[in-house]
Amino acid sequence: MSNVRVSNGSPSLERMDARQAEHPKPSACRNLFGPVNHEELTRDLEKHCRDMEEASQRKWNFDFQNHNPLEGRYQWQEVDKGSLPEFYYRPPRPPKGACKVPAQESQDVSGSRQAVPSIGSQAYSEDRHLVEQMPDPTDSPAGLAEQCPGMRKRPAADDSSSQNKRANRTEENVSDGSLNAGSVEQTPKKPGLRRHQT
């Protein structure tokens, strides 16, 4: 390293170290519009939410906070749940991470079949006025995670069936006389291309 030359145009290492210590480089995350006034931001957000709520009340003549109809151009009336289309009261789909256990039957290792209740058959709904039964605590997404920590899309295969893919055999391997009792697959070959010499 003693043979390394430092050009006059570049600062020496000692000067660079001193400069970094004196004036630390400002962070890349900069506030372009000045410091944030959190009180003003909160007031603006609350005002915006109130304005949106009032606009919705005027548009639909319904008090969404108190769940009461208001006087206006719409006539709100209570209807029976049975007269509504099913998608209005159908329980929501379980979350993507929830276990999907078939409701009919499952088969254990010995081959005997058992009836298994379907997990997630009850509703996961926060709209309690639409759902008559409250979900079981074990049916919650947290309970499902405990019951099915690592559900796989496919069950793990036995060691004997792990090699169920057939080998891709070529013509040379077939002519060796090492044929299996099963069928032989051959890879199709492209027709030979003429090479032009230049």
UniProtKB/Swiss-Prot annotation:
Residues 14-25 have a biased composition (Basic and acidic residues). Gene3D superfamilies: p27. One of its GO terms (biological process) is negative regulation of cell population proliferation. This is Cyclin-dependent kinase inhibitor 1B. Residues 51-91 are annotated as: Interaction with CDK2. InterPro entries: CDI_dom, CDI_dom_sf. It comes from Cricetulus griseus. Keywords: Cell cycle, Cytoplasm, Endosome, Nucleus, Phosphoprotein, Protein kinase inhibitor, Ubl conjugation. The gene is CDKN1B. Forms a ternary complex composed of CCNE1, CDK2 and CDKN1B. Interacts directly with CCNE1; the interaction is inhibited by CDK2-dependent phosphorylation on Thr-187. Interacts with COPS5, subunit of the COP9 signalosome complex; the interaction leads to CDKN1B degradation. Interacts with NUP50; the interaction leads to nuclear import and degradation of phosphorylated CDKN1B. Interacts with CCND1 and SNX6. Phosphorylated; phosphorylation occurs on serine, threonine and tyrosine residues. Phosphorylation on Ser-10 is the major site of phosphorylation in resting cells, takes place at the G(0)-G(1) phase and leads to protein stability. Phosphorylation on other sites is greatly enhanced by mitogens, growth factors, cMYC and in certain cancer cell lines. The phosphorylated form found in the cytoplasm is inactivate. Phosphorylation on Thr-198 is required for interaction with 14-3-3 proteins. Phosphorylation on Thr-187, by CDK1 and CDK2 leads to protein ubiquitination and proteasomal degradation. Ubiquitinated; in the cytoplasm by the KPC complex (composed of RNF123/KPC1 and UBAC1/KPC2) and, in the nucleus, by SCF(SKP2). The latter requires prior phosphorylation on Thr-187. Ubiquitinated; by a TRIM21-containing SCF(SKP2)-like complex; leads to its degradation. It comes from the Eukaryota.
